[in-house]
């Protein structure tokens, strides 16, 4: 067994990089490289020396030179014939390899008959180089490829005589394969390189990877020479190559993947006796084995194709980095292209075997080495290219057919299997036709087109095609292609899902093909109207799932099964720049007639949308349309609406004309305002088709999903049953949308307002003379009578629904305006409702009066004067009845009121309110308890209107008559005085609140003061009255009026201090600022007095600086001052004296605490010494008492630290250093307590 050529860590490296070749010429190369026998190698493996190895290397280099010379000569010969492999066997040359033994003797190996191998592949070129390491200092080269040559030898022939002394060859042989030459390091000489033709890989895409070919070439050459020794041998040579491929970074755009894998090739190379029998078999085995290894790489690399790099078909066939391509390149490219027709990859073995069966003889002649893939003969090249074109045309037709499918029918028995779960897209046939016009590779250009289609929001549809069914597909397609008319619902579905309606621009493909409504509808819709992208992909996805084609209806192409259109449309006139938008509920049913496979009978099936969906949709539409409806109702009160077909853009077929009652969907032409188009996402009619059996349900079922309709949407409904040329248009605007939404509330049914507004219902008409000429097959299809009848009923109900809320919206507007104007009124009414004595008639009067006040903001001065005078007279009459007051006293009371009340109107109002509410509890202390100030202020703030005055005055008289039967009038005077005291601050608050008519009220007050000022006699009477009131307060003290008494005592001063209180109330910051400073000073003074510490350190410093005489006098004076002070005052000098007597300790732990303890302790000692502070050390490791003190008072501080006295902790090392930096260490130690 021959396994390697390495001797004592020295490696024999064979490196074949690429060399270019020109033309399609093939060269023959006879190689005779004798190899020693197994026995000789095993016997002499320990005797191989360095010189022997040098000779072996020289022989190899000579062999390489011969190869290069033959390679150059082969370029000049030009093209050879295909049977060249048989001719070159007669022109074999003998190569003699001399191996020197340890003694230095040279033996010549006998020549043998060689089996020639075709080195006819021009794509790859192998450069063989040898390298030997003789110095121990040099590191061996890494060996990525290990070659194990196993020879099963049945004969006993040796290589040559005297091979006992042949130096042995060790087992492991390193053969390094690369694309660039490697220089030799032996004796600083450049290595000799030779070029020989390589073999192409069976992988059609990997044309530059030469590792496997070069290795096999180098091994097979040696095996050929070994087999030439004895032609009668019956032996099989097994070459086992364990390859670890290096990272291969290709320059080609198609392959960018790095791979490193271990691959094993078992190659059976027979001798010349049985080469004719086994060559074909070995080639097939090698091709299939290598195909298995290289297929995963091919699949992954094909996906990395960039569109910009896709060039012509010839460019893709040529291997990158080489000069020219050949038949093998074209054949391999074809395999790659055929692979793109499948979804999960291409079975390489199966197709390879087909090629082998088809051209086994040509492969045997042209590809004897067994490494390259099967190469077809030139006469079969045109046939294969024609087959390629057939595959391309077949693919174009299939893609065209795929894009016209309505939906993905998983139960269809057609040859195409649509995989909608993955990333699918509909490839337009023109783009693929452009792809193959350039004859580019299938996977390269097709993938780029699919990527181009992704910008339209569609998903790629991967089509799985089996080659066995290609003929059946073509026949089936030709039979059904011209008949089936389908809508591109998949494109619409994906367009709605991706929030866009994209129009596909296409030209007519052929006479037998019809461009269906999906794409052309989109293009015409883009020309006629501006389209807003519809949001809500979830709803469209749900609808599309149920929108499969009813195949049983396809078998009966009756009028009922013909394409139907359900029209729900309201025509809106030209609004004045309102945000009026139109949605078109396109409900289309196009049923293919040629579908053969039918499902269950679903004829009467009807998909109903949920009521919440309809309610939300109705609300959203009503929001946009309520205001324009109300405006139109005001202008045109007849209550009828004009429904016209002005925007109709297509021509009705004969079937649609017969069914004149059919309904058509139109796209209104309003370029000024944006539009929202709701498109049907499938051809299945269950979700939106109207059934004749349930005409009552139609009004609820035919709706646009709420998720696809924006809130700014108004609908237009058309009906073709009646003709009313004088019908009016209903205008739906956006200003009353919110009002209508509030009025409608949670009403979701479409017929909620139908019965109430029957006189206002629409007369829905169809004007056939306005229909323009367009093909309905391309646009919207044909309509049936049943759908039109049912849609008319639903449209009438929907139109009635939109009319009714308008009347209520008008009413609601007036109510809202009243509410906005009476916002303050309602708040006041709510406050008044909380009062105990407020009844319903009174509340009604208050509301009426507030309305009057808001309407007439300016009140005449005369009316104000009359009201004030009437209030005063009524108040005087009440007192006259109760206490029999005389006329002079009435004059005094009147003068007093005029003087005290600055704001006459509000004062009179609040005075009587306060009098009522405070007098009643004042007279009934036994029942209700005490009348607190909080209750009085609350009631005073709530009663501020004029309407309450009359009611309160009447109640005053009644209450006083009932309650104060046995009491004196003085009690009433007390309550009057009480109310005066509380009245002024409350009136000021009311003045701030009431800003309307304030200027006029002030004028009225001034006029009243001028006219009603009393004489001096009246003023004296008022003062006398006040004195009497004070006496009466003392008499009534038993009535338990604590708060009332305290307020009444302060009453005489309220007149004088009223404005002062108001000024302080207006400017509280100024008054409080001074107080704050005073408070701060007072607090600091109190704090110092509590401490009773006097800082006399400065005085002591001065004493030391003065002379002795001066110091004595000052000390005496200071001592006198100190004697004058209290004895409990402590000075800082005393504190210092006491602290200086205490010892200072440095607490440390010399035995523990880490390596920082000693330097920190030394730092503390240095600081204390510099500040002239005596100290001593205390070791916590040995002093238990010090340890207890530190644990108790340190609070987690780290050692070392400074402690004064027994347990007065000054600080640890950090705090001491900070104090030292601030020059406060002595103060910290001695001046602190």
Curated annotation (Swiss-Prot):
Biased composition (Basic and acidic residues): 250-280, 287-300, 349-370, 379-408, 484-497, 508-527, 594-622, 631-672, 684-711, 753-783, 910-920, 935-948, 986-999, 1062-1071, 1118-1127
GO cellular component term of the entry, any: cellular bud
Composition skew (Basic residues), residue ranges: 72-83, 183-199
Disulphide bridges, residue numbers: none
Chain intervals for the UniProt region annotation (Disordered): 1-39, 65-116, 160-211, 250-577, 594-825, 851-872, 902-955, 984-1071, 1109-1128
Any single biological process term in GO: positive regulation of actin filament bundle assembly
Alphabetical UniProt keywords: Phosphoprotein
InterPro entries: Thioredoxin-like_sf
Residue ranges, compositional bias (Polar residues): 201-211, 329-345, 409-422, 728-739
Residues carrying Phosphothreonine: 861
SUPFAM superfamilies: Thioredoxin-like
Domain Glutaredoxin as annotated: residue spans: 1132-1233
Annotated Acidic residues bias: 466-478, 855-868
Modified residues (Phosphoserine): 180, 462, 523, 975, 1037, 1046
Misc remark: Present with 704 molecules/cell in log phase SD medium.
Designated name of the protein: Uncharacterized protein YFR016C
């Amino acid at each position: 067994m021959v396994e390697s050529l390495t001797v004592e860590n020295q490696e024999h490296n064979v490196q074949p990089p690429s060399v270019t070749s020109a033309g399609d010429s093939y060269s023959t190369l006879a190689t005779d490289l004798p190899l020693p026998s197994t026995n000789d190698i095993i016997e002499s493996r320990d005797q191989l020396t360095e010189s022997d190895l040098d000779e072996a290397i020289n022989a190899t280099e000579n062999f390489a030179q011969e190869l290069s010379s033959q390679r150059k000569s082969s370029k000049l010969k030009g093209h050879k014939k295909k049977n060249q492999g048989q001719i070159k066997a007669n022109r074999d040359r003998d190569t003699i390899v001399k191996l020197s033994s340890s003694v230095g003797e040279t033996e010549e190996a006998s020549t043998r008959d060689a089996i020639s191998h075709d080195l006819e592949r021009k794509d790859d070129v192998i450069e063989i180089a040898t390298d030997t390491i003789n110095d121990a200092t040099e590191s061996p080269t890494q060996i990525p490829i290990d070659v194990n040559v196993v020879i099963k030898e049945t004969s006993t022939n040796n290589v040559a005589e005297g091979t006992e002394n042949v130096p042995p060859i060790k087992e492991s042989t390193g053969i390094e394969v690369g694309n660039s030459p490697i220089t030799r390091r032996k004796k600083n000489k450049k290595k000799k390189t030779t070029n020989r033709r390589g073999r192409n890989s069976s992988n059609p895409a990997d044309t530059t990877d030469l590792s496997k070919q070069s290795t096999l070439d180098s091994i097979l050459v040696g095996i050929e020479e070994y087999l030439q020794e004895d032609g009668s041998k019956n032996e099989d040579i097994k070459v086992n190559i364990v390859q670890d491929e290096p990272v291969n970074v290709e320059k080609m755009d198609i392959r960018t993947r790095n791979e490193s894998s271990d691959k094993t090739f078992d190659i059976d190379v027979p001798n010349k006796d049985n080469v004719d029998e086994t060559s074909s078999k070995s080639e097939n085995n090698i091709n299939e084995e290598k195909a298995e290894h290289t297929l995963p790489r091919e699949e992954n690399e094909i996906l990395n194709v960039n569109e910009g790099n896709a060039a012509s078909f010839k460019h893709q066939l040529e291997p990158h980095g080489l000069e020219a391509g050949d038949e093998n390149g074209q054949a391999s490219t074809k395999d790659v292209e055929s692979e793109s027709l499948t979804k999960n990859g291409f079975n390489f073995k199966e197709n390879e075997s087909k090629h082998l069966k088809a051209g086994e003889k040509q492969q045997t002649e042209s590809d004897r080495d067994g490494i390259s893939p099967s190469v077809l003969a030139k006469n079969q090249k045109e046939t294969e290219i024609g087959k390629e074109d057939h595959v391309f045309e077949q693919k174009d037709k299939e893609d065209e057919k795929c894009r016209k499918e309505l939906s993905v029918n998983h139960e269809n028995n057609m040859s195409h299997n649509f995989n909608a779960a993955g990333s699918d897209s509909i490839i337009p046939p023109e783009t693929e036709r452009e792809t193959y016009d350039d004859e580019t590779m299938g996977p390269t250009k097709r993938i780029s087109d699919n990527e181009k289609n992704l910008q339209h929001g569609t998903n790629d549809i991967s089509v799985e095609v089996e080659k066995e069914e290609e003929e059946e597909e073509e026949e089936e397609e030709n039979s059904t292609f011209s008949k089936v008319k389908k809508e591109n619902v998949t494109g619409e579905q994906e367009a709605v899902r991706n929030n866009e309606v994209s129009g596909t621009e296409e030209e007519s493909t052929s006479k037998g093909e019809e461009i269906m409504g999906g794409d052309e509808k989109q293009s015409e819709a883009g020309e006629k109207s501006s389209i807003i992208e519809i949001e809500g992909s979830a709803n469209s996805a749900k609808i599309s799932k149920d929108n499969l084609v009813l195949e049983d209806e396809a078998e009966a192409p009756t009028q009922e099964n013909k394409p139907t259109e359900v029209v729900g449309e309201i025509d809106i006139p030209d609004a004045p720049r309102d945000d009026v938008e139109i949605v078109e509920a396109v409900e289309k049913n196009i049923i293919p007639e040629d579908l053969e496979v039918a499902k269950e009978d679903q004829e009467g099936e009807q998909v109903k949308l949920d009521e919440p969906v309809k309610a939300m949709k109705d609300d959203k539409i009503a929001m946009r349309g309520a205001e324009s409806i109300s405006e139109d109702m005001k202008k045109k009160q007849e209550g009828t609406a004009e429904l016209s077909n002005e925007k109709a853009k297509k021509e009705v077929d004969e079937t649609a004309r017969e069914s004149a009652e059919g309904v058509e969907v139109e796209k209104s032409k309003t370029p000024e305002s944006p539009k929202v188009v709701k498109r049907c996402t499938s051809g299945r009619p269950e979700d939106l088709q109207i059934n004749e059996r349930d005409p009552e349900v139609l009004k609820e079922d035919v709706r646009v999903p709420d998720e696809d309709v924006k809130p700014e949407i108004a609908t237009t409904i058309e009906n073709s049953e009646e003709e009313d040329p004088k019908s009016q248009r209903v205008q739906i605007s956006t200003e009353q949308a919110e009002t209508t939404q509030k009025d409608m509330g949670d009403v979701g049914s479409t017929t909620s307002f139908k019965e109430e507004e029957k006189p206002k219902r629409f007369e829905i008409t169809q004007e056939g003379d306005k229909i323009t000429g367009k093909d309905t097959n391309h646009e919207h299809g044909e309509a049936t009578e049943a759908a039109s009848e049912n849609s008319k009923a639903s449209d009438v109900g929907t139109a009635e629904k939109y009319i009714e809320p308008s009347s209520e919206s008008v009413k609601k507007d007036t109510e809202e305006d009243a509410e906005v104007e009476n916002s303050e009124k309602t708040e006041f009414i709510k406050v008044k409702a909380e009062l105990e004595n407020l009844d319903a008639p009174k509340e009604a009067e208050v509301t009426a009066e507030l309305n009057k006040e808001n309407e007439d903001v300016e009140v005449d001065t005369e009316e104000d004067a009359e009201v004030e005078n009437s209030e005063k007279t009524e108040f005087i009459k009440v007192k006259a009845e109760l206490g029999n007051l005389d006329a002079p006293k009435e004059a005094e009371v009147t003068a007093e009121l005029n003087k005290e009340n600055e704001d006459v109107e509000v004062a009179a109002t609040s005075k009587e309110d306060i009098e009522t509410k405070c007098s009643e509890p004042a007279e009934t202390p036994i029942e209700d308890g005490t009348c607190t100030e909080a209750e009085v202020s609350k009631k005073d703030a709530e009663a501020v209107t004029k309407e309450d005055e009359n009611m309160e005055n009447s109640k005053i008289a009644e209450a006083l008559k009932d309650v104060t039967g046995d009491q004196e009038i003085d009690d009433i005077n007390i309550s009057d005085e009480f109310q005066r005291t509380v009245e002024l601050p409350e009136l000021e608050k009311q003045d701030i609140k009431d800003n309307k008519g304030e200027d006029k009220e002030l004028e009225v007050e001034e006029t009243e003061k001028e006219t009603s000022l009393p004489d001096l006699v009246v003023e004296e009477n008022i003062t006398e009255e006040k004195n009497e009131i004070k006496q009466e307060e003392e008499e009534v003290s038993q009535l338990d009026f604590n708060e009332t008494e305290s307020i009444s005592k302060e009453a005489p001063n309220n007149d004088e201090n009223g404005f002062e209180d108001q000024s302080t109330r207006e400017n509280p910051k100024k008054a409080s600022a001074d107080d704050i400073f005073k408070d701060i000073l007072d607090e600091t003074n109190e704090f110092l007095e509590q401490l009773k510490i006097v800082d006399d350190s400065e005085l002591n410093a001065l004493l030391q600086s003065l002379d002795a005489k001066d110091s004595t006098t000052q000390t005496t004076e200071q001592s006198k001052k100190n004697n004058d002070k209290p004895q409990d005052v402590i000075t800082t000098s005393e504190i210092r004296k006491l602290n200086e007597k205490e010892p200072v300790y440095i607490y440390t732990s010399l035995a523990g605490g880490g390596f920082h303890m000693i330097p920190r302790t030394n730092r503390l000692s240095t600081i204390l010494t510099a500040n002239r502070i005596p100290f001593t050390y205390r070791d916590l490791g040995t002093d238990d008492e010090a340890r207890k003190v530190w644990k108790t008072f340190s609070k987690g501080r780290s050692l070392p630290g400074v402690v004064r006295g027994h347990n007065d902790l000054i600080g640890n090392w950090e705090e001491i250093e900070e104090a030292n930096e601030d020059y406060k260490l002595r103060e910290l130690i001695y001046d602190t307590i």
